[in-house]
């Protein structure tokens, strides 16, 4: 169908992108966010070509990428700083990757949604949806739509009550996050304006410039690592594991700690049931090792809007959408899930393994771009 009415549940990256993409194709769209305002955790995010193309498609690129950061490379290093693997980005003819503040991205998506005519309803908690397009709310009210998009996150109520079977892996690893403002902390012998990932035993430190003055740090560890899980980071323990990074830990001292999150992987038996589509982390959550969580959500959202608008009916469009987007997104998931293994192999093997996984990452990203362009 060319257009109709859609109810979108979830005011995150996937939900806002889907709502805007549908509205731009002539749909009337109402978006529901259970919180009292559209907001997000204030950390950094990587956006690759597929996400950048989606932002451009919905008119959110200019505002979203204002003050975003483009580094020339991402280098994976041993705990002593030795390079193990390097990915060149933002070079002529190569992959593009920008980093930015997550709240800047959400803000731009929110503005784009309102400009497109989306009705944004905050404090509106959907509790279930059925195959005929009926959405029920915590107030006891309900509404019906031609299309329902369940983009309510990894703990999705709508997905769980829709009856779709799925596999959910709660991983041992997770991350605590810190934003550092001001002059970048000095790392001996390294370009602090590049992205770096340091590996030391079961721990990783991701160092990500996000703007000219703000740097995002992700402290990745197992969920039983007492130096990382809890109300405060034990930065002395991290300094013992990564002595080269003492200036980074000094810069992080006293900064607000963004909540610990365990990494998860979710795969559904199907991405839709009747007139209900499941999108983003609710459908294909993945650990952040290849930086594609947000990109795949935006990529999938724009593809969804195109498929249902260009098909004879909604259910046919949802089938076409899944057939086109699921294979490359699951390839990105698989690559990201395999990246967890780096922490459990001897250091001498990490370089060759990272090379193999890096080639898989490049292949997965390339497929996402091709599929998005063909949608």
Swiss-Prot record:
Keyword list (alphabetical) reads: Monooxygenase, NAD, Oxidoreductase
Induction per UniProt is: Up-regulated by PQS.
Q: Catalytic activity annotated for this protein?
A: 2-heptyl-4(1H)-quinolone + NADH + O2 + H(+) = 2-heptyl-3-hydroxy-4(1H)-quinolone + NAD(+) + H2O
What's a Pfam family in this record?
A: FAD_binding_3
MF GO annotations = 2-heptyl-3-hydroxy-4(1H)-quinolone synthase activity; FAD binding
This enzyme's EC code(s): 1.14.13.182
The record ties this protein, via InterPro entries, to: FAD-bd, FAD-dep_Monooxygenase_BioMet, FAD/NAD-bd_sf
Q: Which family does it belong to?
A: Belongs to the 3-hydroxybenzoate 6-hydroxylase family.
Q: What does this protein do?
A: Involved in the degradation pathway of the Pseudomonas aeruginosa quorum sensing signal molecule HHQ (2-heptyl-4(1H)-quinolone) to anthranilate. Catalyzes the hydroxylation of HHQ to PQS (2-heptyl-3-hydroxy-4(1H)-quinolone).
**Name of the molecule in the record:** 2-heptyl-3-hydroxy-4(1H)-quinolone synthase
